[in-house]
Amino acid sequence: MLIISPMHNEAEHIEGVARALAAQTRPPSLWVVVNDNSTDATGEIAARLAEEIDFMKVVSTPASSDVDSADRLAVALEARAFNRGLAAVGDISDFTHVGKLDGDVELGPDYFEQILAEFDADPELGIAGGWILECKGGEWRPTPSAPEHVRGALKLWSAECFAAIGGIVERLGWDGIDETLARMHGYKTRSFRAAEARHFRETGSADGRLRGHVRWGEAHWILGHGVLWTAARSAKVARIRPRGASGAAYLYGYARAAALRVPRVEIDGYRKFVQTEQRRRMSSAIRAAARPGRADSARVV
């Protein structure tokens, strides 16, 4: 199992992430930390940890001139750093799985053991991951998502699936594109509640909450999401802090991308596949909401 962790200014979290990986009941064969142009002590701490953890390797990326440092999400620098880590490894044919782990995510001690067991139990499983816990009001609480969506912060691909989809693309929305391509190739994508990880930075907050929601809306335009689906989705987003403004920012990002004709994913059959899935999920949500006592099960994510 190969794990790659793009890290930008994660000096506060990297040691905890490393200790959690070293304590895994099934640790990775190789963990590549990509110091992505950090301006804090991330590189120095990573180098020290690599002397202690035998499966850890550190690589650094050159400075990027094409990005506002406050808007790394827009140009998918995380995906770019991941691919540079992959290139540094070279031949990955000996690995059964390839994973991405963010530099602010601490895994439970048996996290990989549980996820790998799911792969062993289902040969059709292509992408898997656990649930993220975030600290809200002093308590670690799960941040639910659709069962078929795996958060980009802790994805694990089977080697066969990763090869079939051609790895990950370096553009906004990469962590939705890979899942759709996997399902188009006949693989399942699943998140599993029993496997938990603590996320020390709220999802979408690294570039500022509202900017993150704008980029989220733009990403969903790129991914080929339909207008009705996006409108329904915005109602859920609006419940995220800052309430109301988050939903408006999300819709603005989608509408602006549409107005600017931001290029969408242009793969034969891709958009039709996406919108067919969305119609199915919306129909299921409507049916669930119509059942007495089942309104809570109607979720559009």
Named regions from a protein language model:
Residues 35-45, 63-65:
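A conserved acidic beta->alpha catalytic loop
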Residues 91, 106-141:
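Conserved donor NDP-sugar-binding/catalytic core segment of glycosyltransferases
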